């Protein structure tokens, strides 16, 4: 029975999950909910189902896999990672995965706070000023390894790819000083399942954020 992934019809917090499902050749329904336009941003399409799905903490994204009903994007990825043994194999690798999962979420939220701010035009230069230091930390953490936990891909690589790619869209030159991060992105996009997905009609790279964001390339 196929899994069901529910989320808005945007990239957002579901991108890494969709990439992981495609990479692992998982059968799933990508259930997308639409949001209305300004000024109301009507969410009735989701709200009409929100409390009828049996979710403990009803929210988007959600994943339903048989009797397992999961919310919180990182919990979903971790669940999928365990199913496919892509969570790190040694304690050192698992520590790296745990640290990076949270670091990537911090970076994602920092960018989102800027992009959703009514004061976007003032906050953008401030954010860009601190961006090289953020990217430097990711570059140093990756080092010469092909993947962030080591020699084998883990679910956290899907998260970090998403975060790096969002920043590459936000500031196209942000990875230029970090060849290993550029190589990582190219390596990830070169994976056959990922490459095939990105060329398919199912692939959704934009919009990144919901309609109320002040920066949201279409």
UniProtKB/Swiss-Prot annotation:
GO terms of biological process kind: cellular detoxification of nitrogen compound; cellular response to caffeine; glutathione metabolic process; hepoxilin biosynthetic process; linoleic acid metabolic process; nitrobenzene metabolic process; regulation of release of sequestered calcium ion into cytosol by sarcoplasmic reticulum; response to catechin
Keyword Transmembrane on entry: no
Q: Which residues bind substrate?
A: 116
Kindly list the places in or outside the cell where this protein is found, as annotated in its UniProt entry: Cytoplasm
Query: Any idea of its EC number?
Result: 2.5.1.18
Has UniProt tagged this entry with the keyword Membrane? no
Name of protein: Glutathione S-transferase Mu 2
Q: Which gene encodes it?
A: Gstm2
